[in-house]
Swiss-Prot record:
GO process terms (BP): L-leucine biosynthetic process
The reaction(s) this protein catalyses: (2R,3S)-3-isopropylmalate = (2S)-2-isopropylmalate
Protein's UniProt name: 3-isopropylmalate dehydratase large subunit
Role summary: Catalyzes the isomerization between 2-isopropylmalate and 3-isopropylmalate, via the formation of 2-isopropylmaleate.
Gene3D superfamilies noted in UniProt: Aconitase, domain 3 (3.30.499.10)
GO molecular function: 3-isopropylmalate dehydratase activity; 4 iron, 4 sulfur cluster binding; metal ion binding
Tagged with keyword Aminoacyl-tRNA synthetase: no
Species assigned in the record: Salinibacter ruber (strain DSM 13855 / M31)
Pathway(s): Amino-acid biosynthesis; L-leucine biosynthesis; L-leucine from 3-methyl-2-oxobutanoate: step 2/4
Enzyme Commission number: 4.2.1.33
Gene: leuC
Lineage: Bacteria, Pseudomonadati, Rhodothermota, Rhodothermia, Rhodothermales
Length: 472
């Protein structure tokens, strides 16, 4: 087993007791909830006449079903209106802070937590959402949990978990122009597979990781679960502390100095031991795209789509299904594949630096969205939306032909009205390309970085953004 890692230190600090099942009871530092996975948990509390143990450690927002075009109440979608009303009642009844649509702070739960300063190094964080691993970018242990576990955390502020092994993922070198954090994580998942991380927590490190912004680190940790890992994290450093300082719920004054001292102590020791280590050359990574129906079916923009006939039987059936669904053939690259929709959003890539990079590229290219492409930008939070508007980014997107929307999960999972239609193919900055993920059972999704989404939007087809950059 690993020793001296951040994972070991944070785990041990939060361990309450060992259970007869072999699991460890862990105290939860922060519990984030939203409108989709929390109602049943609150219902179970009521059935057992239980209360919320630590309401000050629970924070709520609405993101999955909220409309991004019109927030006038009641919502046009009756189900969305009902789910929001239930969350309003539950948070009021149990004295839980709720970042509601009128607060100016509503947004995707994994965007709101960090920008509010709720996410802090050394915490254990849980949420009824797979991508809670996002918070690991701050040196936390972030775990997605199910409804019964949400109930348990509400009632006890604890969770039962098995300890995982730790795999160090070292990314050396420097990224080239047109290559971003999204490309790093797609490369990792493409190489290690969607089940490669089962039984592991990933620790990301190396020069390429250290050089990323906090938003970039969040993109990488966000998709750890897509590679099978239970969580992923980056050791906190000066970049982490600079991002956090001054945020609404971050420590301040003398408490800030004490907190930084504490956070530095949880970093993995220089002589920490890992259960496995995998190394990547960041300078060799090119813009990545998916060609299939899992995030693991990813390749560089210049690489040919693999031939299922050359795969082992375990991968062959999935690859054949993917090619049939995507209407692709082996041997060709993804460059030149026609795009119907361009989606810039999700808890992976809808933060302010993502929007800045995308808007900057649009200005550099000086070109509008292609005539036959439906393009939208969905900021990760109302805070991101306001900042983007203040900086003029929203105007850049609108002038180029992007639809500028309100904050929410939107087309990442198609639970509101933002959905693909029929066989549309979407160039998407989101995290999952499963069949039916974006609202249409026949819709097709190609995952890529925000810059690659912009390139696809203006060209009308999947495009190597580096070529466009060289031409301007």
């Amino acid at each position: 087993m690993s020793t001296g890692t951040l994972y070991d230190k944070v785990w041990n600090r939060h361990a309450v007791r060992e259970l007869p099942t072999g699991e460890t009871q862990l105290f939860v530092g922060l519990h984030l909830i939203h409108e989709v996975t929390s109602p049943q948990a609150f219902g179970m509390l009521e059935e057992r006449d239980l209360s919320v143990a630590f309401p000050a450690r629970t924070f709520a927002t609405t993101d999955h079903i909220i409309p991004t075009a019109d927030l006038e109440r009641p919502f046009g979608d009756d189900q969305a209106e009902t789910m929001l009303q239930v969350l309003e009642r539950n948070t009021e009844a149990y004295d839980i802070t709720f970042f509601d649509p009128s607060s100016g702070a509503q947004g995707i739960v994994h965007v709101v937590g960090p920008e509010q300063g709720l996410t802090q190094p050394g915490m254990t964080i849980v949420c009824g959402d797979s991508h809670t691993s996002t918070h690991g970018a701050f040196g936390t242990l972030g775990f997605g949990i199910g409804t019964s576990q949400i109930r348990d955390v509400l009632a006890t502020q604890c969770i039962a978990m098995e300890k995982q092994d730790v795999r160090r993922i070292q990314v050396d070198g420097a990224l080239g122009e047109g290559v971003y954090a999204k490309d790093i994580i797609l490369k990792i998942i493409g190489e290690l597979g969607v089940e490669g991380g089962i039984g592991y927590v990933y620790e990301y490190g190396g020069p390429a990781i250290k050089g990323l912004s906090m938003e970039g680190r969040m993109s990488i940790c966000n998709m750890s679960v897509e590679g099978g890992a239970r969580a992923g994290y980056v050791n906190p450093d000066l970049t982490t502390f600079e991002y956090m300082k001054g945020r609404p719920h971050a420590p301040s004054g003398a408490a800030w100095e004490r907190a930084v001292d504490c956070w530095q102590q949880i970093q993995s020791d220089p002589d920490a031991t890992y259960d496995d280590t995998v190394t990547f050359d960041g300078s060799a990574i090119e813009p990545m795209v998916t060609w299939g129906i899992t995030p693991g079916q990813a390749l560089g923009i210049s690489e040919p789509i693999p031939d299922p006939a050359r795969m082992d039987s375990g991968d062959r059936a999935t690859a054949e299904k993917a090619l049939d669904h995507m209407d692709l053939r082996p041997g060709r690259t993804m460059e030149g594949v026609n795009v119907d929709v361009a989606f810039l959003g999700s808890c992976t890539n809808a933060r302010i630096t993502d929007l800045r990079e995308a808007a900057s590229l649009l200005e550099r290219l000086g070109r509008p969205v292609a005539d036959d492409v439906r393009a939208m930008v969905v900021p990760g939070s109302q805070g991101v939306k306001q900042q983007a508007e203040d900086e003029g980014l929203a105007d850049t997107f609108r002038e180029a032909g992007f639809d500028w929307r309100g904050a929410g999960c939107s087309m990442c999972l198609g639970m509101n009205q933002d959905q693909l239609e029929g066989r549309e193919l979407c160039a998407s900055s989101s995290n999952r390309n499963f069949i039916g993920r974006q609202g249409s059972k026949d819709g097709r999704t190609v995952l890529m970085s925000p810059a690659m989404v912009v390139a696809a939007a203006v060209e009308g087809e999947v495009t190597d953004v580096r070529r466009l950059m060289r031409e301007t």
